[in-house]
A protein has these predicted regions:
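Short helix/loop capping segments that flank catalytic or ligand/cofactor-binding pockets
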Residues: 85-86, 143, 239, 293-296, ...
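Mid-to-C-terminal polyanion-binding domains and interfaces
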Residues: 66-70, 309-354, 387, 400, ...
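Acidic-glycine-rich active-site phosphate/pyrophosphate-binding loop
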Residues: 66, 165-175, 261, 514-517
Length: 565
């Protein structure tokens, strides 16, 4: 059962933000998210943390500049998700502009699995590279880097995943989460790390006079890729990431984007001039990810690197078809998961582990996320892998760091996990199929130790009541222009309403007419058909509804409770 709670607001911070000219509601919302001064809301690129603060970024830049000068062959080895694809495309665009001889390789997840493995090194060696550059992977590739070294191939690792006990012996490792790195933003996505390396490389090339007599490549032109990868990877939107995403969205809205990004907006039926974080995370990101989930992410990367508008649209349509196929597979898996969950005492457990031999390896992460959202339990979903192995993808709730939890499982049950890695909120692992039940029990034991009853109770966190006078289109438009996402959630308000009317629209949604404080407003409940009582307490967000060129205010109801009056 979910309960509505209100975020505390530091009044001193709120008052300071109002004095500095912020709208009173925006000031309250920002103060509740830890913002205390106007400068933390501004999005100027000049406010970014400098590349010199990122450990080994300058060392990587020197290695890359030397390789460019020597005409060495570079090969980017990418991860197969949206973050990896955008990081690869950004690197390809930037390095090509800098005069590098560069190509890319993305492992097929079904054949090779994740990361720079020795098998991938053998495959990469066919292109005769002098230098491998990992993007969004590599921090755990100890054996892969050794395999490359034995072949005389240098490796630069750019990654953001949490390091293990042993680091690969790469020529340079750039990762804000490695020991000794004082970079303040630990939440850079893989594409963000690669962007910073390219900034450092441009500075190094400038120092060497490489741009003498010609225009420097404008890395800001790649911020659309950076915004897409950052939002799609669901990394926390701290100040640095908000600046990067905001600047990327501004360029998209102004029509300054890669042809592939333009094409993805087209197949999603969205207007890029009104681009939002929602578009990047829920519409473009899934279409790119569909390539890595069901086919080969090379298709997604080609979409992002091509400069041919027609080719970009052709690929985007293929990605759209793959995404539709993914939805069908996901729906079938969800039905099967519901059958498995019906046999479990989910309410009495602290975790959920699910496995079905028919499940698709590329879709288990989405399934785990859906189950986690519905039941508010850290969840792993598994599908068959190679030979006698199964591969799982997990999603967690606040209070349980998923990678740390897996590390604890591995220490308590040596040999149980074949391999694992990830973040606080998401992780992946491989184990033997025969060990699934043993893993489920071990993970449950760890979750029971780490989670309190309070953390297992779902809470709908809101920004409190909104004065009726602020139920207007202007505020909805103001909030829509801000950057919201992981760690900096979109405002959700809570008030009591009288329900004047409700009807089903689009077969699975409900449209409502609500009244509060003498004001009548339209609202929507998506994917909900049950009728509301005459009075409700609702958690809602303001949205801008556009129809036939006219914009109106519309509330989106996220949660409701009966008021008792």
């Amino acid at each position: 059962m979910s309960g509505i709670v209100t975020r505390p607001v530091p009044l001193r911070s709120q008052d300071q933000l109002v004095r500095e000219g912020l709208h009173p509601v925006l000031a309250r919302v920002c103060a509740a998210r830890g913002i205390s001064r106007r400068g933390e809301v501004d999005d100027a690129l000049s406010g970014l943390i400098p590349p010199s603060d990122l450990l080994n970024a300058e060392r990587a830049a020197v290695l890359l500049a030397d390789a460019i000068a020597a005409g060495k062959r570079m090969l980017i080895v990418a991860d197969y998700d949206c973050d990896g694809a955008t990081a690869c495309a950004l690197g390809m665009r930037a390095l090509t502009a800098f005069g590098a001889n560069v190509g890319y390789l993305v492992p097929n997840r079904f054949e090779f699995g994740y990361g720079l493995t020795p098998e991938i090194v053998v495959l990469a060696a066919k292109s005769k590279p002098d230098l491998l550059i990992t993007v969004d992977n590599g921090i755990a590739s100890v054996e892969g880097v050794e395999a490359a070294r034995e072949l005389g191939i240098e490796v630069i690792v750019t990654d953001h995943h949490l390091p293990g006990a042993e680091l690969p012996r790469a020529a340079a490792i750039v990762n804000p989460n490695q020991a000794g790195c004082a970079f303040p933003s630990k939440s850079l996505a893989g594409v963000g790390v690669m962007f910073y390396v390219m900034l450092a490389l441009r500075a190094e090339l400038r120092k060497r006079g490489a741009f003498s007599g010609k225009e420097e490549p404008a890395l800001a032109d790649l911020l659309d890729l950076l915004a897409l990868g950052t939002v799609a990877d669901v990394v926390p939107l701290d100040f640095n990431n908000r600046v990067l995403v905001s600047q990327g969205l501004k360029r998209i809205r102004a029509g300054r984007m890669q042809e592939g990004v333009r094409a993805l907006f087209a197949v999603a039926g969205r207007d890029p001039s009104r681009a939002s974080g929602f578009d990047l995370g829920f519409l473009l990101g899934p279409r790119l990810n569909a390539a890595g989930r069901l086919s080969d992410m090379s298709l997604g990367i080609e979409c992002l690197v091509t400069t041919d508008r027609g080719r970009a649209l052709e690929i985007a349509r293929q990605l759209d078809d793959l995404n539709r196929e993914r939805r069908v597979i996901e729906a079938d898996m969800q039905s099967q998961a519901d059958e498995l969950l019906a046999k479990l005492s989910v309410g009495d457990s602290c975790s959920i582990s699910l496995y079905d031999p028919s499940w698709h390896q590329g879709v288990v992460g989405i399934l785990a996320g859906r189950v986690k959202e519905r039941h508010h339990r850290p969840t792993f979903a598994f599908a068959p892998g190679n030979s006698d192995e199964i591969r799982g993808s997990g999603r967690s709730i606040a209070g349980l760091h998923l990678r740390d939890a897996l590390d604890l499982v591995a220490k308590r049950a040596p040999g149980l996990l074949v391999r694992f890695g990830g973040h606080a909120a998401a992780a992946g692992l491989t184990l033997r199929a025969a060990d699934f039940t043993r893993f489920a029990e071990a993970f449950e034991s760890v979750a029971r130790q780490l989670l309190s009853p309070g953390q297992l109770a779902r809470a709908v966190e809101t920004d409190g009541s909104l004065e009726p006078a602020y139920l207007d289109l202007g505020l909805a438009q103001l909030l829509e222009r801000q950057i919201w996402g992981q760690g900096f959630p979109q405002p959700l308000f809570c008030d009591e309403f009288e329900v004047l009317g409700q009807r089903v629209v689009g077969e699975k949604h409900t449209k409502l007419n609500l009244s509060r404080g003498g004001r009548t407003v339209e609202a929507m409940r998506f994917n909900a058909l049950d009728s509301l009582p005459s009075r409700v307490r609702a958690a809602y967000r303001l949205s801008v509804n556009e129809f036939n060129g006219a914009q109106t205010l519309q509330l989106v109801i996220e949660h409701w409770e009966k008021t008792g009056t």
